[in-house]
UniProtKB/Swiss-Prot annotation:
UniProt-annotated binding residues for IMP: D13, E14, G15, K16, N38, A39, G40, H41, T130, R144, Q224, T239, R303
Entry similarity comment: Belongs to the adenylosuccinate synthetase family.
Official protein name in the record: Adenylosuccinate synthetase
UniProt remark on cofactor binding: Binds 1 Mg(2+) ion per subunit.
GO cellular component: cytoplasm
Subcellular localization: Cytoplasm
GO biological process terms, semicolon-separated: 'de novo' AMP biosynthetic process; IMP metabolic process
SUPFAM superfamilies: P-loop containing nucleoside triphosphate hydrolases
Binding residues for GTP: 12-18, 40-42, 305, 331-333, 413-415
Enzyme class: ligase
This protein's UniProt keywords: Cytoplasm, GTP-binding, Ligase, Magnesium, Metal-binding, Nucleotide-binding, Purine biosynthesis
Protein's organism: Parvibaculum lavamentivorans (strain DS-1 / DSM 13023 / NCIMB 13966)
PANTHER family linked: ADENYLOSUCCINATE SYNTHETASE
Length: 430
C-alpha cells in the first residue's frame, strides 16, 4: 500500500478534480498541502455539482478525513462561506471529518487589498493573480509576521500580533497613498470569525502520523500545477507556493518517505489562464476549437483559458522537477475529430535547439516550439473504459506522449464522468 500525491504537470486546470475524486473514494485521508482558495475544481457526484476552492475533495465523501495542512493559507471568511455552500447541498462539515493545521497562515482583508492594488497598478509585470490575497499572505509568512490559525485561540495576544503585521502593511500603504489601518477592526473581525474555524484546529502532523501507523491510505491533493511553482515554474508568472510533490511533505508535516507514488495530472493538450509564456499557444481557430470543446473557463475566476497543442518538453521537465512517477492523461476526448494533431517535441531559441524551458523570462519569451505531426482520429474516445474501445490513432498518440515525457500513463480519462477512466497502474498499490 502506497500513499499518493497528486500534482498538476502543466499550468493547472489539468482535470485534477475528477482524478482526485476517483482516488479519494479509495483513500482514508485527503490532504491539501499548499495554496489557498485560488485553486478551483469541480466535482460531480450522484448528479450533484460541487465547486470547491479551498476544501479537500474528500470532504464530499462520507467516512473520509479531510485535512488542510500547514502549507495552506486560509481565508477564514472564504472557508466559512465554502462550508455553508456545500452544507446547503447536504454535506456536513464537522471536526470529525475536517482538520485544519494549527500552524497554517491566515489570509486577511489587508492581503486581498494589497493583491488587488498590485494587479491594478499600471507599472510593473502583471502576473494575473486571482486577487484573493494568496501571495501577500505567503509574504507575511516568510517575513515571520503572519497571523496563524492558532493565534485565534488567544485573543489576549491577537492585538499585539496584528499591530506588528500592520507596522509592515501601513508602511506599504503610506507609500501607495492609501489610508492606514487600525488594528482594532481587524482584531474584532478575527474574534467574530474565530468560532467558525477553531473547532477544526488540530496538530495535523500528529493526526497524519496516527493515520500512517494505522495503515490508512493518505491522498495528498496538490493545487495549481508544477509550471506555476514559485521555484520551478515560469517565474514571475507563478503562484506563491511550491506546487511540486516535495511540498506535500513540508506542507502537511510528514516526512518525504510517507509519499509512495506521485501522480501527475496531464491534459492531452495545453492550457493556461492568466499571463506568462506559453510556447504552444494557438490563437487561431484550432485554439478556439480546443477551448470550446474542452469548456476551458476557470472555476474560480471564470476567465477564458489560453489553449495550445501538447508541450512534451514542458511536461517532461515537470515530471523531473516534480518527482512524478506516472501521469493521468485527461481530456483525450477533446482531440476527437482533428485531422491531424501536433505535439511539441523540442524548442528553438535564437536558432538553437533546446530540450527544456529556460529559467529566464526573456529566454522563455523567445521560445519557438518544434512540432511533430500525428494522424488524428474520427471515432469518439469519449466514455471509453478500456484500450480496446480506443481508436488505433488515439492509442498511438498516448504511447508517443509516454515516450516523449519519459513516464508511463497510469490512468487515462476520456470524459468528465468519474467512471470513464482507463486504469493501467493503481497508484495506491506498491
Amino acid at each position: 500500500m502506497a500513499n499518493v500525491a497528486v500534482v498538476g504537470s502543466q499550468w493547472g486546470d489539468e482535470g485534477k478534480g475528477k482524478i482526485v475524486d476517483w482516488l479519494s473514494e479509495r483513500a482514508d485521508v485527503v490532504v491539501r498541502f499548499q495554496g489557498g482558495h485560488n485553486a478551483g475544481h469541480t466535482l460531480v457526484i450522484d448528479g450533484v455539482t460541487y465547486k470547491l476552492s479551498l476544501l479537500p475533495s474528500g470532504i464530499v465523501r462520507k467516512g473520509k478525513l479531510s485535512i488542510l495542512g500547514n502549507g495552506v493559507v486560509l481565508d477564514p471568511w472564504a472557508f466559512a462561506k465554502e462550508v455553508d455552500e456545500i452544507a446547503s447541498k447536504g454535506v456536513a462539515v464537522t471536526p470529525d471529518n475536517l482538520k485544519i493545521a494549527e500552524n497554517a497562515v491566515l489570509i486577511l482583508p489587508v492581503h486581498r487589498e494589497l493583491d488587488e492594488m498590485r494587479e491594478g497598478a499600471n507599472s510593473g509585470v502583471k502576473i494575473g493573480t486571482t486577487k484573493r490575497g494568496i501571495g501577500p499572505a505567503y509574504e507575511d509568512k516568510a517575513g515571520r509576521r503572519a497571523i496563524r490559525v492558532i493565534d485565534l485561540a488567544d485573543p489576549s495576544t491577537l492585538t499585539i500580533k496584528v499591530e506588528g503585521l500592520l507596522a509592515h502593511h501601513n508602511a506599504l500603504r503610506r507609500g501607495n497613498r492609501l489610508e492606514e489601518l487600525e488594528a482594532g477592526p481587524i482584531v474584532e473581525a478575527l474574534k467574530e470569525i474565530a468560532p467558525r474555524v477553531l473547532p477544526f484546529v488540530a496538530p495535523v502532523w500528529n493526526v497524519l502520523d496516527e493515520a500512517k501507523r494505522k495503515g490508512q491510505r493518505i491522498l495528498f491533493e496538490g493545487a495549481q500545477g508544477t509550471m506555476l511553482d514559485v521555484d520551478h515554474g515560469t517565474y514571475p508568472f507563478v503562484t506563491s507556493s511550491n506546487t511540486v510533490a516535495g511540498q506535500a511533505a513540508g506542507g502537511s508535516g510528514v516526512g518525504p518517505g510517507a509519499i509512495g507514488f506521485v501522480l501527475g495530472i496531464t491534459k492531452a493538450y495545453t492550457t493556461r489562464v492568466g499571463e506568462g509564456p506559453f510556447p504552444t499557444e494557438l490563437t487561431d481557430e484550432v485554439g478556439q476549437r480546443l477551448g470550446e470543446r474542452g469548456h476551458e473557463f476557470g472555476t474560480v475566476t471564470g476567465r477564458k483559458r489560453r489553449c495550445g497543442w501538447f508541450d512534451a518538453v514542458m511536461v517532461r521537465q515537470a515530471i523531473k522537477t516534480g518527482g512524478i512517477t506516472g501521469i493521468a492523461l485527461t481530456k483525450l476526448d477533446v482531440l476527437d475529430g482533428f485531422d491531424e494533431i501536433k505535439v511539441c517535441t523540442s524548442y528553438e531559441i535564437d536558432g538553437k535547439l533546446v530540450d527544456h524551458l529556460p529559467a529566464g523570462m526573456d529566454a522563455q519569451a523567445k521560445v519557438t516550439p518544434i512540432y511533430e505531426t500525428l494522424e488524428g482520429w474520427k471515432d469518439s474516445t469519449q466514455g471509453a473504459r478500456s484500450w480496446a474501445q480506443l481508436p488505433a490513432a488515439a492509442v498511438k498518440y498516448v504511447r508517443y506522449v509516454e515516450e516523449l515525457i519519459e513516464a508511463p500513463v497510469a490512468l487515462l480519462s476520456t470524459s468528465p464522468e468519474r467512471d470513464d477512466t482507463i486504469l493501467m497502474k493503481d497508484p495506491f498499490e506498491d
